[in-house]
Design a protein with these regions (language model features):
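Short, acidic/polar
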Residues: 16-33, 344-357, 450-467, 521-535
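Beta-sandwich interaction modules
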Residues: 147-156, 166-169, 199-248
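Active-site-adjacent "subsite" loops/lids of carbohydrate-active enzymes
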Residues: 3-19, 65-69, 97-173, 188, ...
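Aromatic-lined substrate-binding rim segments of carbohydrate-active enzymes
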Residues: 26-29, 46-95, 102, 111-112, ...
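Active-site-proximal loop/short-helix segments
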Residues: 53-57, 98-119, 124-139, 343, ...
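Substrate-binding cleft of secreted/luminal carbohydrate-active enzymes
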Residues: 35-50, 458-487, 498-584
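Structural recognition of the beta-strand scaffold that forms the well-ordered cores
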Residues: 3-7, 38-43, 89-93, 265-270, ...
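Glycoside hydrolase catalytic-domain groove-lining segments
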Residues: 49, 380-520
Length: 584
């Protein structure tokens, strides 16, 4: 079994306080070889001309990545040349759904934003790092169901906000504080008229349903906190309770907002201060609110993780467990970084990036479909014009206005990925290189069209393999800490099913673990990793891909600090027994 390691230009270069140079990267690659690796999987953000590191990048706070790209305009070509010198192969990790920064809460530290923001539009954001092509074509991202967008026209001020409890009994209501903002950069107390009433009212509460459907529970009596007589003209406001309130409900049924005419207001949720990606800047009054972002929200039975692919509306929230509730008028029309593969020019652009990776000297391309996009409503995205038109042509149904078969919709969306993968495979093989594909278990790709799935797409993984589009299947997210027994059992079933299918077809397999050093003693971490390596080798995998470089190696003022040295001694011994020569 070979050992590879994933290196991430983003994490290694933007997280380091020490400047990277060409010589340091060269030393890094040699160090990786010396640890016993035979391959590098390079998560890169493009060369200088692709524009991902233009000035104002929200995740390059120190400017280290931009400075490096100025001196080494094509980092991937540099990596390939240096890696090949020491006998390492290089595989470009092509993350097709991470073509922009991940969350709408990301922004520039105060006073550092450029005059012209380089990013793509998001509610409450002040710029999102993205490839230049995507910034120039923001409508090529995955699009929301049109029924959920705010109607065009002049916004009327907000007059009423209602908070609904899930029963007719609510403990005492503490003082309520309202704060408002024009820019989501600084919040100030609301100074207008305001009246707070607590009562029990009859209501038919809404239940979450993907658009355009609407569902309701049984009519009943429910406790209601009504804040009325308002005159809020600002697009952003926050509500904070000064003490415990015991207010609990599903997100769909929790809040109603009306304007001065009594019409419902379309809005986006926010529950935590925005971040500068590396650290929180403190309270939302000074930092702003991370709208439409699902991190750390204490929902009951929430699946968790940045790759959560359900919508938040169905989950139950105790308001006592969040510091405030933020409201932004309107909805994000597009997801941050997920592209709409139904557009031919999107697939062409992604193929152009494959060509760039091949021209740089890569030995293969490792295609990954996971998205880091942080969004609270995944089920209501995927309604770009070509999807709508194709569904209407195939089934005679207008999915923007009528109820529709969501399984057929997921299946259709999956066909566009199949088109891309087939073309990418043909391009890669025409250069004599290898096509790798990530197979993901958490969230699972092993879903039927009728089931919830990663990005609400049917991933027809058996077809990819049976059609011969793939050379190596890379198993990723088949382990994670803090999973329920039921989740792990489901993952294990998929593992066996996929591994057996690969065996029947004679496909090579790789395994990418999901370790994290944080919160573990080094000896426990090493023991966990070694047990996984032995299990994976016993199951017949050809590659174990350590994930990722910054977990094990850190650049410091005194050079590179290598963690888990016992692990690398074991890896070198494994290579020695396999008859592999030392690399240096």
């Amino acid at each position: 079994m070979e050992f590879h390691m994933t290196l991430d230009f983003r994490d290694d270069f933007t997280a380091a306080s020490v400047p990277w140079t060409a010589e340091r990267l060269r030393e890094y690659i040699r160090l990786v070889a010396d640890l016993g690796m035979q391959g590098i999987h390079w998560i890169e953000m493009g060369d200088k001309e692709m524009g991902k590191w233009d000035r104002g990048s929200s995740t390059d706070l120190t400017g280290g990545a931009r400075a490096f790209v100025e001196s080494v305009p094509d980092p991937l070509a540099f990596v390939c040349e240096e890696a090949h010198h020491v006998g390492l192969k290089v595989y470009a990790v092509h993350k097709i759904n991470d073509m922009a920064s991940f969350g709408p809460g990301r922004f520039y530290p105060l006073g550092t934003a450029p005059d012209v923001l380089p990013g793509i539009p998001q509610i409450g954001g002040s710029g999102q790092m993205a490839f230049r092509w995507l910034r120039e074509h923001p409508d090529r991202r995955v699009e929301i169901h049109p029924s959920l967008l705010e109607a065009k026209g002049i916004r009327k001020p907000v007059r009423t906000i209602r908070f609904w409890h899930e029963t007719d009994r609510l403990q005492g209501v503490p003082y309520i504080e309202l704060l408002v903002s024009e820019t989501n950069a600084r919040y100030t107390p609301y100074r207008g008229s305001c009246r707070v009433d607590v009562s029990v009212r009859r209501r038919t509460p809404p239940v979450f349903a993907p658009a355009p459907e609407r569902r309701f529970a049984k009519e009943g009596e429910f406790a209601c906190i009504q804040i009325s007589g308002l005159e809020i003209s600002q697009p952003f406001f926050g509500i904070r309770f000064a003490g415990a309130v015991g207010l609990t409900n599903t997100l769909t049924a929790l809040v109603e907002v009306e304007d001065v005419s009594g019409a419902p207001v379309v809005f986006t949720w926010g529950f935590f201060p925005r971040s500068d990606y590396s650290t929180s800047l403190g309270t939302f009054e000074e930092a702003g609110i991370g709208f439409d972002a699902n991190w750390l929200i204490p929902f009951e039975n929430h699946p968790g993780g940045h790759d959560w692919q359900h919508s938040a509306g169905r989950y139950r929230l105790n308001v006592d467990k969040v510091p405030f509730i933020g409201i932004a008028r309107g909805r994000n029309r597009f997801l941050t970084s997920s592209v709409e593969l139904a557009y031919p020019d999107v697939r062409r652009w992604l193929l152009d990036i494959v060509q760039y990776e091949l021209d740089a000297g890569c030995d293969g391309v490792d295609i990954r479909v996971e998205s880091h996009t942080q969004n609270m409503d995944f089920e209501n995205y995927g309604f770009g014009k070509p999807v709508v038109e194709a569904f209407r042509d195939r089934y005679g149904v207008d999915i923007t206005r009528e109820s529709f078969d969501r399984g057929a919709w997921r299946e259709l969306r999956g066909e566009y990925f199949d088109l891309f993968l087939k073309d990418a495979s043909e391009l890669i093989r025409s250069h004599g290189k290898e096509t790798w594909i990530h197979l993901t278990a958490y969230p699972s790709m092993d879903r039927e069209p009728r089931q919830q799935s990663l990005s609400q797409i049917y991933w027809n993984w058996r077809r990819w393999m049976a059609e011969g589009w793939v050379d190596v299947v890379n198993f990723k997210r088949f382990q994670a800490r803090n999973l329920s027994p039921g989740q792990q059992e489901e993952i294990d079933r998929f593992y066996r099913k996929a591994l057996n299918f690969c065996g029947e077809l004679g496909l090579r397999t790789a395994y990418t673990p999901n370790p994290r050093f944080e919160g573990m003693r080094e000896e426990d971490f090493v023991d966990m990793e070694l047990r996984t390596i032995r299990r994976i080798a016993g199951d017949g995998f050809e590659v174990y891909n350590f994930y990722e470089g910054c977990t094990y190696i850190r650049l410091t003022e005194n050079g590179f600090q290598v963690n888990a040295n016992q692990l690398w001694r074991e890896v070198r011994e494994w290579n020695r027994k396999a008859g592999l020569p030392p690399r240096s």
